[in-house]
């Protein structure tokens, strides 16, 4: 690419005529990431729109999830980037759900860029199907902004730090996941996590089937600890479902409250927002609890006593728990252990939204704990930066070193 390349944006309506382009560099097989556009000088002073890695990431989001809420897509990418692709008729807004979906033209472009992607499947416009896809997209955008590799097509990708959506496998004729309700699998740090969407009215789950599928599909993947994550749009949604008393018609199934009470694996609560993004980044750091405890307590840090794995440190003789992972059952275990040790209150630290939405009410106001907020400075010391991941705003290059420009795509 020439050093004279200049950035350009496309603004207008779909009826606006696009610049004339040539066929050169149009077809490709490549790897890359996704978004806005740049132009390069052409003979006769023609200008062509060049797709960037950010553009291609937007299109891949829609291939994986089929529907992404407009507000979620524009939280991960610039609004102008999304509008550019809409103007080019590569994506369109499904008005009833206020969610973007891919057009036939967008699918053709994506197939040219990534020949080995999951096959395009026409979106189902039933409300329940659309809602399920939107929830998957919320999980995916949260992980994406945490720097997790999300565009995976097989569970083997979890040998590295990545997220895999089982719904991708369910679209290939066979269904190795059966009727399990797992929304995503995540390998981050030393953890292998099964993520379930838990919000009001979500229903019941066959826990034995879930755990069997989780173990069978990830047995060959190295991870020191397996865990489960309950996710939703907010902590309030998760806790609302967990606190609801339900009558069951099928004794083989468990409510998510029953899963919460009986699960032997670590269990984290996570919202699909900026706090959830930070939470995932913290989980990606091996030994994050001790590291954060040392950063926060500084010279006041003292190691926890033997036989108290639910403590992360002692702070002036008081049990200290690092609660940024939102393992509430571990906090409750620390409270009980402290009382058995003759200590009436523990100390815990967490992210601001966690403190305000959950921990103050459950622990500070009930006298169970002193609750501290983790500062940005402490997070920067652990993570380097608290800013969410943003893909590079660079041209998308094919495996042959060419670029993708605007092809004369047919109207969808």
How would you describe each model-predicted region?
Residues 2-164, 168-192, 229:
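Nuclease-adjacent, charged terminal/linker segments that flank catalytic cores
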